[in-house]
Every structure is written in structure tokens, then in C-alpha cells.
Amino acid sequence: MKAIIVLLMVVTSNADRICTGITSSNSPHVVKTATQGEVNVTGVIPLTTTPTKSHFANLKGTKTRGKLCPNCLNCTDLDVALARPMCIGTIPSAKASILHEVRPVTSRCFPIMHDRTKIRQLPNLLRGYENIRLSTHNVINAERAPGGPYRLGTSGSCPNVTSRSGFFATMAWAVPRDNKTATNPLTVEVPYICTKGEDQITVWGFHSDNKTQMKNLYGDSNPQKFTSSANGVTTHYVSQIGGFPNQTEDGGLPQSGRIVVDYMVQKPGKTGTIVYQRGVLLPQKVWCASGRSKVIKGSLPLIGEADCLHAKYGGLNKSKPYYTGEHAKAIGNCPIWVKTPLKLANGTKYRPPAKLLKER
């Protein structure tokens, strides 16, 4: 029995060649695994893409808002938010919005001291709502407000469809008719007038000028005090008399004075208050806003549709589940950002071509 076994081993060992391994071509695919590090495999499916910059687009299945009022020609978003004459129109509903003006400005109406308040934020505040509408009624009777009666001031730089002069529809420039004298602080209540449980955004402000103009308009050339309060937020201002900075953002408007504009957010059923002296810009029409719209920084125009809006790349279609490149805010059905490309191995672990053993 032992002799037979020895014979078999000899026969086997005298075979011409013995092959080890699996025959395979060279593999260019390398994947990094959790347990074995880098491994060559016979096939992979790429899971990542590196996007290129493109136009922004409407998110598929929904409307995306670019300009607040697309049909308001030659109007900035701040013009629309303040309801400048000729810039009043319908703001479309939208689930997503493009923040395309980094520093919103107004023009061709009245020089605004933008940096005294948070007024630049108003267009972006509105953009964050899905539904936005301007009230059809004024929130208070400005002509009969405390300290009046008032006439409502206008500017030749703000023509409207019926007159060569006008003013923002969201505010009334309260100029005393007869009683042009200094006044102690006066208080007006601002009721909630929206009808569908929306947030009410109430715009107000004040006008100031040089000493001569302040005396002529209001009978008082001293700095005036103003306070607004709503939803637990109180803001105080003191007006500046003369010495105003140049208003290059407003295109060199001719007025000697300046206005400071602010807003307050009133929740359903809540009353706001404004305490004021001379030169007040009393609230008139208010914004009624509801729902949420996702906001992303981008640019116009909006072209076509896309699965995803990306702050750096624009409109993206989700061809792969992951992407590499610049990481930035994105909204919609977006791929997930990863630092390095990901691959799914769909073949076997690569083994080099079979090696020949030495003949015995």
C-alpha cells in the first residue's frame, strides 16, 4: 500500500507543468477597502461625478423664484420690497428662491441710508416665504395719525402711472399741514390686517434733512427720536441732521435729504407700535407672507429644469449619487459631496496571470 502511494506521488510530480492562480488580463481599477487597503479589481462602477458650472434652473416639479417680481421691469428687488411706484406687481409663489442680489439697493426714488438699518435684508426676508402678497388696504390712516393732520409728501423722482410724483406704497411721508412745531414723542399702534394667518411685514422709517429744510418742513431742526416694537423686538433711532454721505448706490438722486427705512415682523393677531417725532414715514400697505421657500445664492437667468440647485455649479442633474469638487449649499434632489471619488466594485479581486512552476 505504501509503494502505491509513493508511485502516485511520483507520477504527479513528473507532470509537465502545474498552474496556480486564475487567468486574467491586467486591471486598471483600484479600490480602497476598509479591511485590505487598496485592492485591484476586475471591474468598477463610478459613483461620483465632478460637475461643471452651468446656468441656474427651475427645480424639477416646482417653480423657482429669481427676481421677486419678474414682470416689474427696471426694478431692483428692494424697489419691489418697498413698493416703489412702477415696481408693484405679483410676486409668484415658489418652493425655492435664488438670492441673486448680494447687496440689494434701490434707485430713482429717494436716497436711502441703507447701512443705518437692516433694510437690505428685506428682499431676502420676503424671498424666504413661499407665498407673498401686498395688502390692498393701508394699515393706518396716515393723514390723521397722532401729531397731524398731515399732508403726504411725494418726490418727483418717484413718478407713478397717474402723477409725476409719488412715494413708496409701503410708507406715507407725514408732513404737518399747519402745526409745524416740535413735538414730544407720539405713539401709533399698527394693527394686524393680514387675513390668512400670515406673517405681516410692516415697513416704516423717517426722513431727515439739513437744518433749513427740517425747519421748513417740520418746524424743528433738532435730531428726532424714533422707536419701533413688534414680536418682542424693539429698535431705537435718532435722526441725523445734514452731513449725509454721498448716495452713489442710488444713482446720484437730487434730494438734499435722506430717509432711513426699517421693517418689523408681526405675527398673526399681534399689534406693533411706532413712537415718533417729526419726519416719520408711517406704514401703509404691508406684506402678508406664509409658507417657506428654500433660498440659495445664485445668479440669473433661470434656464430649463434641474434636479438640484448648487451655489457654485448652478443647475445639476443627479447622474451619480455623489460628487466631488467645490462643496457649497445645495437644494433639491442633490448628489452628496465627498472628498474623493467613490467606486462600486462589480467584479472579482484581480489576480495576476498564472505563473509557471519549475519542472522537477
From Swiss-Prot:
Residues 1-15 form the signal peptide. Glycans are attached at residues 40, 74, 160, 179, 210, 246, 317, 346. It is found in: Virion membrane; Host apical cell membrane. GO terms for molecular function: host cell surface receptor binding. The keyword Acetylation does not apply. It is a single-pass type I membrane protein. One of its GO terms (biological process) is symbiont entry into host cell. One of its GO terms (cellular component) is host cell plasma membrane. Keywords: Disulfide bond, Fusion of virus membrane with host endosomal membrane, Fusion of virus membrane with host membrane, Glycoprotein, Hemagglutinin, Host cell membrane, Host membrane, Host-virus interaction, Lipoprotein, Membrane, Palmitate, Signal, Transmembrane, Viral attachment to host cell, Viral envelope protein, Viral penetration into host cytoplasm, Virion, Virus entry into host cell. In natural infection, inactive HA is matured into HA1 and HA2 outside the cell by one or more trypsin-like, arginine-specific endoprotease secreted by the bronchial epithelial cells. One identified protease that may be involved in this process is secreted in lungs by club cells. Palmitoylated. InterPro entries: Capsid_hemagglutn (IPR008980), Hemagglutn_HA1_a/b_dom_sf (IPR013828), Hemagglutn_influenz_A/B (IPR001364). It comes from the Viruses. Its main location: virion. Binds to sialic acid-containing receptors on the cell surface, bringing about the attachment of the virus particle to the cell. Plays a major role in the determination of host range restriction and virulence. Class I viral fusion protein. Responsible for penetration of the virus into the cell cytoplasm by mediating the fusion of the membrane of the endocytosed virus particle with the endosomal membrane. Low pH in endosomes induce an irreversible conformational change in HA2, releasing the fusion hydrophobic peptide. Several trimers are required to form a competent fusion pore. Homotrimer of disulfide-linked HA1-HA2. Belongs to the influenza viruses hemagglutinin family. This is Hemagglutinin.
